[in-house]
């Protein structure tokens, strides 16, 4: 029986309709084999379980409200699918300390054939030989400390180009969309790190990458829902949102394939990168440690552009919005940069260790606006969490957004206060180092492997924009409302402002670039 492909703007309505279908009757009424009665759970409804409590376009906030009302460890059920929701730093610490391997699976992918988060991807790969091989390759050839030092010049070149684009806009008194310009900077840097060359200006490659990344970002919530309900709906021959997802995935596949072909054609005539050369060697060499396919390479590159590039540019936009809304923080940050870097050169990533307030600003922005608010894993075996038994194959959702705004862990949790990250640890606070209350990039062995690169991108971009420009906005304050419909936390009203070159740095910087 051929699968039925369903696309809809409202996935919850589709699932509700399915619940009343005669075909799905026995599926939805089938009881889980393991009893969850002892685990705290909000009141549920017949058939749909807790679905009615989650009908929100901002799912992380819906889950935060549930935890605030019913507790930090909850059992939720949507139809017959069980979830464990964790919103406590102490519980998260227990899970990632004692059960890290057990929760090292992300479960099934949304759609196997999709380049983004499909069966060929690194992000969605099960914890096993392939994932371990790719993680080692990524760490040793691209994102580890030594590879980041080797690729430092690439990012420095792109930071200068970023500055010059903003300066040109400023001279023309044109406004800029911070997310778009930051995305261009990050994508160009990442592409150069992977391939050793810049995007083709003539072919508008970076614009096409940004467009496709935005399209996939808009589908991120549908990816999440499709993944969560895949096992259940496969019994009915239904595949949620497959058409929409595959259209964008195929476009990305065509673009990445052209990138690979161009790299291969020029391998003999230009300097490549250790990362791409290692990937292609693992693809071609029959005796390699782990034989990968071309789809593996294309999926990995796609995930880099979606995960690293989009998440970093989103974080840059949020941090700049918070800085512009708090003039005293902007001035304090600029003073620190001037005292360490001076006024005759751009801030560089080698300056970051000597800029503690800039580091604090970056961390505070990530605390308030983690690009990915939910950490989703799956228990491979049954275990005990917080004194309660959790059966195997149960989905784990760690609400990092809620944890990083928990008033029990953070004073004035909804306020932008970078100083909180400057406070020295007392003996009492030393104990809190064992509690995970700050995890913008996840935790455990499946945490984001590009977290160090993310800090570099956000730190250098914010540092340059504060060092070199003042910023004009329409109105007194920037609207910090979150956008709906996506899994990433983005701004409902993208930050648009006008850069004004600072006279004290303008001439000296230009003469040195």
Curated annotation (Swiss-Prot):
Cofactor entry: heme
Domain of life assignment: Eukaryota
Keywords: Heme, Iron, Membrane, Metal-binding, Monooxygenase, Oxidoreductase, Plant defense, Transmembrane, Transmembrane helix
GO biological process: defense response to fungus; terpene biosynthetic process
UniProt tissue specificity: Expressed in root stele, root cortex, root epidermis, root pericycle of the root hair zone, and quiescent center at the root meristematic zone.
UniProt-annotated binding residues for heme: 448
InterPro entries reported for this sequence: Cyt_P450, Cyt_P450_CS, Cyt_P450_E_grp-I, Cyt_P450_sf, Plant_metabolite_P450s
Function: Cleaves the arabidiol side chain at C15 to form 14-apo-arabidiol and a side-chain fragment. Involved in the biosynthesis of the volatile homoterpene (E)-4,8-dimethyl-1,3,7-nonatriene (DMNT) in roots. Involved in the production of DMNT by degrading the triterpene arabidiol. May be involved in the defense again the fungal root pathogen Pythium irregulare by producing DMNT.
PANTHER family reported in the protein's UniProt record: CYTOCHROME P450 705A1-RELATED, FLAVONOID 3'-MONOOXYGENASE-RELATED
Descriptive protein name: Cytochrome P450 705A1
Source organism of this protein record: Arabidopsis thaliana (Mouse-ear cress)
Classification lineage: Eukaryota, Viridiplantae, Streptophyta, Embryophyta, Tracheophyta
